[in-house]
Amino acid sequence: MERTKKITAALLAAATVITSGQAFLMTGLVAQQNSRTTIEDTQVPLYSKPAGSHVLTPIASGVTVYKNDKATLDASNTASGYIMVKYTGSVGKIKVQVSKSGSETYTYDLNSSGTYEVFPLSEGNGSYQVKVFENIQGTQYSQAFSQSLDVNITDTFGPFLYPNQYVNFNPASAAVQKGAELSSGVTDQIGVVTAIYNYVINNLTYDTAKAQSVQSGYLPNVDVVLAQKKGICFDYAALMTAMLRSQDIPTKLVVGYTGSLYHAWINVFLEGQGWVDNVIYFDGHDWKLMDPTFASSGKQSKEIMQYIGNGGNYKAKYSY
């Protein structure tokens, strides 16, 4: 009997220890459940819309310059995504090539007046070659200048915010003023993009005669396009790009193919979305591609909007 009492007492003690352990564990769980941890809400990136407009101005600051008797390259602002080149020789027809290792070679016409022109470093960081060529005859050229550059762009949007040879504007441009007018009262990027898009497709008409007669080397004059309210695809895209860039929205003027046609369109960077290729308008349900030429000349028919809405119809080659 005495032995039985001792065993019973031992079991009760063990039960007490186990029960106490359970009570301790449960108390710990309750304490953990009731403890407070501060978790901040995720911040939504906000668009800082400029008052009126904001135009970045390229400058040939002379800090980093390469030159010979034929050409001068100012590479002082490669970190901002652009270079400036001028020709100082005597030949009338000049070409510039800007190429990054492993990427497309960008070929431009260069004026022969001895003034700088701006060229974007569209392909991002890496090793570039900048070459200037003088025309001999026909399509034959001789190299007049060559320089390699190691580029490290600190502002990845720089190439698509600054004006350049293809998208040429300044603070006094009528296109910039119109962009500010269209964007007044709008607070977000989508609103700005939509306002500019709607204006262009509703007020510009496709210039068929110009499309049939345009020559190689043609560069859009965005203020002329705005005043005449007509143009080719290149004009549409350049005008919208200028307006959007002046509203601090990174915008690419893209040249490539739609089917077998050589064509131009634009892409924008939207905070919270990233680069939106060929898209400008959200109707509450679907994004619409950003190509303003087809939307305008097609009068926004169901068929043309379906074509524009299929990104597979677009093959980008160059971005300016």
Enumerate the language-model features and the residues they cover.
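Active-site nucleophilic cysteine motif
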Residues: 192-196, 229-244
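Hydrophobic/aromatic-rich core segments of domains that either
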Residues: 235-313, 317-320
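A broad, low-specificity signal for short, low-complexity segments enriched in glycine/proline
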Residues: 42-47, 92, 212-215, 224-231
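Secondary-structure boundary elements
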Residues: 163-227, 276, 284-285, 290-296, ...
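Short N-terminal helix-initiation segments at or just after the protein's N-terminus
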Residues: 71-75, 209-214, 234
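N-terminal accessory/pre-domain segments preceding catalytic cores
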Residues: 2-188, 275-276, 311-320
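Catalytic cysteine-centered active-site loop
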Residues: 211-212, 219, 230, 251-260
